[in-house]
């Protein structure tokens, strides 16, 4: 951001010295958009299943869309853009002469002039979080509302989602003509929150029983978490019984489809099954038990693991990226009368997972390391 305010999308090359970081000297500016106000400026950036880059931009901010950008397809504001950063598409339309991308065959594209060819979906207020279902490829948009309604939309090429004529399903700035508009698959009012944080359709295994195939999302203000199921004739929405997590800013998924979320407190949280167990041997869960305390912990963490299973038992600690940071036991059956401990003093603050694996079951427990 600068003065005048603008949003920038840039490409960086990985550092040759450290491939996990970007080389700041390699910046290539792909796109810059002038912003009239200091909110609703952007936020979402991801490659879709088609290999194109998708970027979301709000209506330019302030409140009530004073510049009427939501229903103006000749501006890139209030939209999700689809860009080809590998070349091979049409020339940029509304991105300016210095834009470094081409335009794929978006539905709205009509050549120079008229609607911006870069637009994939529009009529959005603040779609700062959107995602794609890793199984079906379907795009999901969480659009932050104005006075009363937060909404979830299914992304369609060329779709107009109604802002600022509509807020969710409600008429906002009439006259309100619904023709040609796409309305939310779900909405909730401000008695439950005030700023939706979009998530993902869960495709992992750790919480498949509870969340499989459902769109998991939350609210920044209330900290509530929900799972939306649209597989039936009518969508159903369930608040997850995990408490509330205020200032929830973003969700993410790993290579296995496991789901995480973060807050402004700097911690990373991961979704697990309600029972935190999976069993393949048909034996009762009582034969394997795992408890971890204290949490939060600053230094010594105690792990009580009971496993009467035949064969070896392994107990290890993992960070949120799935990297093993400590092995507490790898051998014969364990008794809870002999607790395990590990020193967390050398670990960065954050969420960790203690996992016990036997021939019959896998149990996991979370522990937060605080500083």
Which stretches of residues belong to each language-model region?
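Recurrent small/Gly-Pro-centered beta-turn motifs in extracellular repeat architectures
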Residues: 1, 57-59, 143-144, 219, ...
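Asp-box/WD-like beta-propeller blade repeats and closely related beta-sheet repeat scaffolds
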Residues: 5-46
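Beta-propeller domain segments
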Residues: 8, 59-238, 257, 271, ...
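Short glycine-/Asp-/Thr-/Trp-enriched loop segments that recur within the blades
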Residues: 34-43, 120-122, 246, 334-337
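Conserved blade-ending motifs and adjacent loop-strand segments that build the rim/top face
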Residues: 235-255
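Blade-level signature of beta-propeller repeat domains, shared across WD40, Kelch, NHL, RCC1
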Residues: 249-276
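Low-complexity, Pro/Thr/Ser/Gly/Ala-rich linker/spacer regions in secreted
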Residues: 272-288
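C-terminal outer-membrane/trafficking sorting elements
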Residues: 283-293, 297-371
């Amino acid at each position: 951001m600068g003065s005048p305010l603008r949003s920038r999308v840039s490409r960086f090359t990985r550092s040759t010295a450290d491939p996990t970081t970007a080389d700041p000297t390699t910046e290539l500016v792909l796109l810059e958009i002038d912003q009239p106000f200091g909110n609703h400026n952007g936020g979402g950036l991801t490659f879709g299943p088609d290999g194109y880059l998708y970027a979301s931009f709000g209506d330019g901010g302030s409140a009530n869309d004073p510049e009427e950008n939501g229903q103006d397809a000749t501006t890139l504001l209030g939209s999700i853009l689809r860009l080809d950063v590998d070349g091979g598409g049409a020339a940029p339309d509304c991105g300016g002469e210095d834009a470094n991308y081409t335009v794929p065959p978006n539905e709205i594209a009509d050549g120079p002039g008229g609607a911006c060819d870069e637009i994939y979906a529009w009529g959005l207020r603040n779609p700062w979080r959107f995602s794609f279902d890793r199984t079906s490829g379907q795009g999901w948009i969480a659009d932050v509302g104005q006075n009363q309604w937060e909404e979830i939309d299914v992304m369609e090429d060329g779709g107009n989602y109604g802002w600022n004529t509509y807020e969710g399903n409600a008429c906002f700035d009439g006259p309100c003509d619904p023709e040609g508009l796409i309305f939310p698959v779900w909405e909730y009012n401000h008695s439950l929150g005030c700023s939706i944080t979009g998530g993902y359709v869960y495709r992992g295994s750790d919480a498949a029983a509870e969340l499989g195939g459902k769109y998991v999302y939350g609210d920044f203000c209330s900290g509530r978490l929900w799972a939306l199921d649209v597989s039936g004739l009518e969508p159903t929405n369930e608040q997850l019984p995990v408490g509330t997590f205020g200032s929830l800013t973003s969700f993410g998924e790993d290579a296995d489809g496991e789901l995480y979320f973060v807050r402004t407190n700097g911690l990373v949280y991961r979704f697990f099954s309600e029972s935190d167990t999976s069993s393949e041997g048909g034996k009762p869960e009582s034969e394997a038990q795992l408890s971890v305390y204290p949490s939060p912990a600053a230094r010594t963490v105690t792990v009580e693991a009971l496993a009467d299973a035949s064969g070896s038992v392994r107990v290890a600690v993992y960070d949120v990226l799935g990297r093993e940071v400590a092995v507490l036991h790898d051998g014969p059956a364990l008794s809870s009368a002999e607790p395990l401990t590990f020193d967390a003093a050398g670990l960065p603050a954050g969420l960790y997972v203690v996992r016990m694996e036997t021939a019959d079951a896998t149990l996991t427990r979370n522990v937060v390391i605080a500083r």
